Amino acid sequence: MTNNAPENAQSYRKRILEKIKPYFSGDSLLDAGCGDGEDAALMAPFFKKTEAVDLEESVNWKKFENTGIIFKTGNCEKLNYPVGSFDTVVEKDMLHHASDPVSAVKEMCRVSAKTVIILEANRYNPIFYLHLTLMGGHQHFSQKRFKEIIAASGTPYEIKRFSARVSPVNSAFMIKLVNNASDLLEKIPFYGPVIEYNMAVLTKK
């Protein structure tokens, strides 16, 4: 498989992978709301079995047909899997599209045997609000609403937050500069309310 994505996009995805990797559990993964499949492909080497599901098929899935990843269409509010089918379930930026996000979280918890990792962009990050909410029409959650949705699942959880963004210029210098800035922003307490990503790690008892 050849990854033809620009280096700045790859760096952004890899940074997010480094943030969630410590919470991976077991041998099997479900990427819920996988989109183009690029994130599933990054996570797959850490598991013996990887499946990925999205409401609509992406033409990009064909790129990964020889990787062993199983792609399926399906609704994450009603996943077509038995209880505890996967050790780890990961979701990134799908939940705000769900008609009932609480039901979607409960479904991910139902099909997980160990861990659910949920990532959603912070609605009130200044750059994300301009680019994703005002211009893109995405209704991302505030930190308060995100926590309410996670808590309503009834599964024990921890809330984490981190900084990650795509470098606006595809150059090694700018990519490094953006990543260094993200490292710095994570250490500044007053940046917390507008930091780029909210993450929940839900652990099955």
Could you describe each region identified by the protein language model?
Residues 98-107:
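A short, conserved alpha-helix within the catalytic core of class I
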Residues 114-121:
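Conserved beta-strand signature within the Rossmann-like core of class I S-adenosyl-L-methionine
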Residues 36-78:
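Class I SAM-dependent methyltransferase SAM/SAH-binding core
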Residues 121-137:
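Short, glycine-/aromatic-enriched active-site segment of Class I SAM-dependent methyltransferases
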Residues 71, 160-205:
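A C-terminal cap/extension of S-adenosyl-L-methionine-dependent methyltransferases
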